[in-house]
Regions:
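Sec/Tat signal peptide C-region and signal peptidase I cleavage site
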Residues: 20-26
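A residue-level marker of the well-folded mature domains of exported/periplasmic proteins
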Residues: 26-334
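Cleavable N-terminal signal peptides
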Residues: 13-14, 24
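Bacterial N-terminal signal peptides that target proteins for export
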Residues: 2-12
Length: 334
């Protein structure tokens, strides 16, 4: 499989039948994962990328919010049959459906985010979430007064362990004595949209001494951010920049530029001349992941903290610090 990197220059719910009505030939399509388009996190980042493309080009796109896993193959076939190109999918659960459908539509280009499908008309985009999580883990440890940090993941799957493992490594890098409290909202897709449980897990972490909690849980993470704000402690957002949700309480957000991936896919994947099948990996060097600093959290991060994070970022890019990727061997050496 071809593996490529996108440069910084490039990185610059309705029913299915209703969505497809009137779809124009070669309009791009985006299918969001379970959890809702407006989850203020992963799916919403994908939506924002589609909207950015629309604003830049004046073009139209079609989209769909999945209601259940059974819709995946049906949605792909219907969009492809209507002439949508490219078809972009957000989420790691698309592997089987896309592997089945892509060969049926050899003239359609597909782009999938967060999983790998080895087909000649598929571009797979992965992110180095572990390196971005390393940086926010370091910032969390530098900010913490208790030395105890929490993590609330969504669905208990390897990808979310990848976030946790990077976070824990970053925390331990700057404070070897840091204590990490790890929890997940569930083992089914419902885990992405359960802010009540996520808030309870954040409270449990606080009860054990945590004063900073990283939420990598999709829509469920909103419960973590709320619980930490209510308690006067700090949270860390994920995927989208969530600093604005609770100014002065969200320490930072581990941003994952799903939005730019979607915009780039809409711009390039519909044309065979610019389509890049194979695997594309976006990391710190490509600004595919990172941490957010803006007017909502700039008073929470000292110049020294930001300087440390930037130094760590440079060392990771240079290869001087190696951040272990949980998904390579299902382990997290700390």
């Amino acid at each position: 499989m071809k593996i490529s990197k996108i440069s910084k220059a490039v990185l610059g719910s309705v029913a299915l039948s209703a969505v497809l009505t009137g779809a124009a030939l070669a309009d791009p399509a985006i299918i969001y994962d379970l959890g809702g388009k407006f989850d203020k996190s992963f799916n919403e980042a994908a939506y924002n990328g589609a909207e950015a493309w629309k604003a830049e080009t004046g073009g139209n796109y079609i989209d769909l919010e999945l209601q259940n896993d059974a819709q995946r193959e049906q949605a792909l076939r219907r969009f492809a049959s209507q002439g949508a190109n490219p078809i972009v999918m957000a989420g790691f659960s698309w592997t089987a459906a896309l592997d089945a459908v892509a060969p049926e539509f050899a003239d359609t280009n597909f782009v999938v985010i967060d999983t790998v499908v080895d087909q000649p008309n598929v571009q797979s985009i992965l992110f180095d979430e572990h390196t971005g999580s390393f940086l926010v883990g370091a910032l969390a440890a530098l900010k913490s007064e208790t030395g105890t940090l929490g993590f609330v993941g969504g669905m208990d799957v390897p990808l979310i362990h990848k976030f946790y493992c990077g976070y824990a490594q970053g925390a331990k890098h700057v404070n070897p004595d840091a204590t990490l409290i790890e929890s997940y909202t569930g083992t089914t897709p419902a885990a992405w949209n359960d802010p009540v449980t996520a808030g309870e897990l954040a409270q449990a972490a606080m009860d054990s001494g945590a004063d900073v909690v990283f939420a990598a849980a999709g829509g469920s993470g909103l419960g973590v951010l709320q619980a930490m704000a209510d308690a006067g402690r700090y949270s860390i957002g994920v995927d989208s920049n969530q600093n604005y949700l609770h100014p002065g309480s969200v320490l930072t957000s581990m941003v994952k530029r799903v939005d730019v991936a979607v915009t780039t896919a809409f711009n390039e994947a519909g044309d065979d001349a610019t389509f890049m099948p194979g695997l594309t990996i976006l990391g710190l060097a490509e600004d595919g992941v990172g941490y957010a600093v803006d007017e909502n959290n700039q008073d929470l991060l000292t110049e020294e903290m930001v300087a440390t994070a930037e130094d760590l970022k440079a060392q990771i890019i240079a290869g001087d610090i190696e951040v272990h990727d949980y998904t390579t061997d299902s382990s997290c050496p700390l």
